[in-house]
Amino acid sequence: MKIEEKIKQKYLYSKNFNFIKIIYFFIQFFKSKFKYKKSYSFGSQDLITEKFFKNKKKGIYLDVGCFHPVIGNNTYKLYKKGWEGINIDIDFHSIDLFNFFRKNDENIQIGVSDKSGENDMFFFHNRSAINTLNPIRGKNAKEVKKIKIDTLNNVIKKTKFANSKIDFLTIDVEGYEMNVLKGFDIKKYSPDLIVIEFMDLENKTDDIYKIEFYKQNLNKILNSELYNYMIHNNYSLVNWTFLDLVWVSNKFKKINS
C-alpha cells in the first residue's frame, strides 16, 4: 500500500475526527465554493449550452432580457470562452453593468417587440428582473411607463452582427417571448440552439413571485402558441429546465446526426 493510501486509511477514513481530516474537509469546502463554479444560470441552462457548443471556440449569441452580466446569465460561460454577441434589456442599470463586465459585447437598452414605437412597461420596481411589457403578467405592477420598443430584426441591423449567423438565442422577457420572436427573422439568423422562458399566462395567481417551475404544465406547453411556432419553424423541443424550454434546429440535428 502506498504512503498516500496509508495516510487516508489512518486519518481520513477514520470514524474519529482528527486534525488532518478537518484540514481535508476545509480544503474540499473551499474548492467547491470558489474553484469549481460550474453554472451561472438560475436553472443550469448554461451547462446545456456549454455541452452543446463544446467544439465551437468562437460564436455569436443574442440575449434578450439579459438583466445581469454574470448572475443568472445564460451566456456568461460562452463569453468567458471567447464568444461575443448582443445583450438587450429595458433597464439602463443592467446595460451599465454589461458595458463594464462585457466590453466585447454590444449592449443595448431598449424594449423588444413585434413592432416599432412605444409600449406600456409594467414596473414592479426599477431594478427588477420581472418588469414586463406583457399586460397580463404585469397586472399587479406598481407603475406603468411608456418606453421605446423595436423589433429584434431592427436592433440587430444596427450592430456589427447584422449579417452574421446567430448561434445561440436566449429570451427571458416575462411572458412577452412570442412578441419578440415575431419580430425576429428566425430563418435568416437560424440559431442552432434557442432557450426561451415559458410563462403560463393563464395562471391566475396574484403573486408574480409564486410562479414556480413545478407549477408548469406539459400539456399547456405542447398546445401553446410558442410550441406550434417553433415546430413550424423546424425546431425540436429537446429539454425543459427550470422555467425555460430548450430548442434545437432540425437543420443542425440533420447535419450532426
Residue ranges of predicted features:
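Phosphate/nucleotide-binding beta-alpha loop and adjacent structural elements of enzyme active sites
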Residues: 1-257
